[in-house]
Design a protein with these regions (language model features):
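Alpha/beta enzyme core
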Residues: 1-111, 116-139, 154, 158, ...
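A short, acidic, flexible beta-alpha connecting loop/helix-capping segment that sits on the rim
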Residues: 141-145
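Short acidic, glycine/serine/threonine-rich loops at helix termini
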Residues: 149
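Extended terminal accessory/targeting regions
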Residues: 175-178
């Protein structure tokens, strides 16, 4: 399994299950330029079509395969492809010239939080991408693995929804935990 290409995924939750779970959005990873590109695009297309029938939006997740470089050129192409397939929003990663990726993508972008970072660094990431045009962040590890996840979620929300700088949000976080 370790040497297998993990970009060949299947849709784990069909539309009926998403409806039963009262899902607000469905997400599908896409592996543009990787071995699993065709199957991931097929999964995305089917999910978008099912979501459209029931008014459930689909988020296209730009995954980066092992052999892929995290360049602004790659992210600009991959986000554009996913958006033009019909997703309502795209999840991608921060990169050099990120504001160009946002400008080239016709739907809102949220940014993945990536690996677990210290709280101040995660808030800096959130601030940087929001200030460059991202509409939100998806920071699972950086919130759930924080020693103070509720306060960290509140600090991230301050950046995304209230215009706090990373420094202001970190100060807010520190005040909340002490």
């Amino acid at each position: 399994m370790l040497n297998d290409d993990l970009s060949h995924e299947v849709v784990a939750v069909d539309i009926e299950e998403a409806i039963r779970m009262n899902a607000d959005c469905m997400a599908v990873q896409t592996f543009i330029g990787a071995d699993g590109q065709l199957s991931s695009i097929d999964n995305l297309s089917k999910t978008i079509n099912a979501g459209m029938r029931y008014s459930i939006p689909t988020m296209g997740v730009v995954a980066v395969g092992k052999q892929m470089e995290r360049t602004d050129r790659f992210f600009k192409l991959a986000t554009r492809i996913v958006a033009e397939m019909g997703v309502q929003l795209v999840k991608t990663y921060n990169c050099e010239n990120f504001e160009e990726i946002v400008a080239a993508c016709p739907v809102p972008i949220v940014v993945a939080g990536g690996k677990k970072l210290p709280e101040d660094e995660a808030l800096t990431l959130a601030y940087e991408v929001i200030s460059k045009g991202a509409r939100g962040v998806d920071m699972g590890r950086n919130i759930c693995q924080s020693q103070h996840p509720v306060e960290m979620a509140q600090a991230v929300a301050k950046v995304v929804h209230e215009g706090f700088t990373d420094k202001e949000a970190y100060e807010f976080y520190q005040d909340m935990i002490h």
